[in-house]
């Protein structure tokens, strides 16, 4: 649990910091537009849009900017025709990596992703080469100063598949189809949710050396800095020393 949740916390904080510098607003707007185009502009019936809007609000994006992105998506004809793509590969130490992208130019995107892998000791794989090592799930993180029995009861009753408590945090894992039901149940009960998102969660984390971790982090950072890249997932288990250094 710790490897997953601590890495999620670090990525969340990094995302907020990047948003303040304007680095990820373009990606968030793109995700909102595509989600609205694919599933309509009603957040209540479009889980992907609801999740994208939540990310944007967490990054302090103005509601007018979000609404305009939704309108562009629903309008359909305006703007670029974005395509969702997923690339799979191996990083330093044989770590499995998934890269989710939204792009209007597949050739540009694959070239940039391949270059990042090559530069930092990895290699791009074929479809299916590592995706079987991950499961699409919902992840909800809460502070553990809330009544644990109540959190567990509500989460499990609403469809959560696992609830774990460690240190100062409660981590709730859900099937994709139960994610919003569980999240709404917790919030309706007046419980405070620190983070929530849909993610590709590694089924098993692979321990790596600190030296390998440093190379892997450079690769992940380079991938995440690409305009077309939306999310990067890996099955690496980082040491406490590395996690602390990233805080």
From Swiss-Prot:
The keyword DNA-binding applies. It is found in: Cytoplasm. It comes from the Bacteria. GO terms for cellular component: cytosol. GO terms for biological process: regulation of DNA-templated transcription. GO terms for molecular function: DNA binding. Keywords: Cytoplasm, DNA-binding, Transcription, Transcription regulation. The keyword NADP does not apply. Belongs to the TACO1 family. NCBIfam families: PRK00110.1, PRK12378.1, YebC/PmpR family DNA-binding transcriptional regulator. This is Probable transcriptional regulatory protein LPC_0711. It comes from Legionella pneumophila (strain Corby).
